[in-house]
């Protein structure tokens, strides 16, 4: 009898350990995986996918720098991938374990931030653009496809208190630099000062620096213009329609150009379950699974096998699938070195304190 009890106890302990091991910890952007996709992965792997969220690259990097750990897969933007590689925080990928790797479009591979894709594979892409209340801006005769709607006091006077911008120094400076005719990655100190002056002149007209709740604020009609990610604006438009709002939400890429964000799948060096991490990455490389992210959330996709499954009405949206001319005006942000980051943070702190 005692032997049987010991055997049962041992089996129960083993089962508990197996259950604990079958959890995948994903550090991801807010609302950045379709719910149906998540549930299907859990069913397929017999595991639980546990997510922790961040709303910006600065927040994600700060959490990791502060010692946050236990993540298996992270979805960082290209400049964060570059920084994480430099810090030695990522596992090198064994591509022989990824049967669906060939689905990735060549145009999104072998980028400067990770030559040869040794550590990362593209997950989705977004642009940073202008989301807006079309009904209100049409009444005022304001062109949303121009960064002046964010930075020109003459335009902002008409919509004072109805504008939010991203609480992210590199994103906001990138937009300001594009408006001034420079590269979003320009690090010339004089050009940064010009961008700071532009931001300070516009700041009194803004309602807030906001990277987390502008979808809701646009959907409710509390704000009329938001600087943010294309996938978020797609969601805001869909939410406003679903709620039967008396106004229409839309989004536009400014003609001066904008920031392109390529988000990537990486395995953190502290992963306790790399086998499950590989299964998740390969699952998301499947064309049908990748297409759900675009169809439900409104991202662009780097997955060629996903294209046949994407809704036709989404493929025609220039902000999500820009043509060659528009693509030429889009720039992925590059990682800053420590000196540049200190200089930008100083300018950013001055902006926040005024």
Swiss-Prot record:
InterPro entries, A to Z: SBP, Sperm_putr-bd
Keyword Cytoplasm: no
Cell compartment(s), UniProt: Periplasm
GO cellular component terms, semicolon-separated: periplasmic space
Transport found in the keyword field: yes
GO biological process: polyamine transport
Molecular function GO labels: polyamine binding
The entry's keywords: Periplasm, Signal, Transport
Signal peptide stretch: 1-20
Family: Belongs to the bacterial solute-binding protein 1 family.
Function of the molecule: Binds putrescine and cadaverine.
Name of the protein: Putrescine/cadaverine-binding protein
Organism, as annotated: Pseudomonas aeruginosa (strain ATCC 15692 / DSM 22644 / CIP 104116 / JCM 14847 / LMG 12228 / 1C / PRS 101 / PAO1)
Species lineage: Bacteria, Pseudomonadati, Pseudomonadota, Gammaproteobacteria, Pseudomonadales
């Amino acid at each position: 009898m005692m032997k049987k009890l010991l055997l049962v106890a041992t089996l129960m302990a083993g089962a508990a350990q197996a259950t604990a091991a079958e959890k995948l910890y994903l550090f991801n952007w807010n609302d950045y995986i379709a719910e149906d996709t998540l549930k299907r992965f859990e069913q397929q792997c017999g595991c639980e996918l546990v997510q922790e969220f961040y709303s910006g690259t600065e927040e994600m990097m700060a959490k990791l720098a502060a010692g946050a750990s236990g993540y298996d897969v992270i979805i960082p933007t290209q400049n964060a991938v570059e920084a994480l590689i430099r810090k030695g925080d990522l596992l090198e990928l064994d591509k022989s374990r990824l049967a669906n790797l060939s689905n990735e479009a060549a145009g999104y591979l072998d980028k400067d931030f990770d030559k040869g894709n040794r550590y990362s594979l593209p997950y989705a892409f977004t642009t940073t653009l202008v989301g807006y209340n079309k009904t209100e801006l049409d009444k005022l005769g304001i062109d949303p496809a121009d960064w002046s709607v964010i930075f020109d006091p003459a335009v902002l006077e008409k919509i004072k208190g109805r504008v939010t911008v991203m609480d992210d120094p590199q994103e906001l400076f990138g937009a300001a630099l594009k408006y001034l005719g420079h590269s979003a990655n320009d690090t010339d100190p004089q050009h940064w000062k010009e961008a700071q002056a532009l931001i300070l002149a516009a700041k009194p007209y803004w309602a807030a620096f906001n990277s987390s709740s502008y979808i809701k604020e646009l959907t409710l009609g509390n704000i009329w213009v938001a600087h943010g990610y294309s996938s978020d604006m797609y969601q805001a438009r869909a939410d406003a329609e679903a709620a039967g709002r008396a106004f229409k939400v839309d989004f536009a890429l400014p003609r001066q150009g904008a920031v392109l964000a390529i988000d990537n799948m990486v395995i953190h060096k502290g992963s306790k379950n790399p086998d499950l991490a590989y299964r998740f990455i390969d699952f998301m490389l499947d064309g049908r699974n990748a297409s759900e992210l675009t169809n439900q959330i409104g991202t662009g996709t780097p997955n060629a096998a996903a294209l046949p499954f994407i809704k036709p009405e989404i493929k025609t949206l220039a902000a999500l699938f820009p043509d060659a001319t528009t693509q030429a005006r889009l720039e992925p942000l590059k990682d800053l070195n420590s000196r540049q980051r200190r200089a930008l943070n100083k300018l950013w702190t001055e902006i926040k304190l005024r």
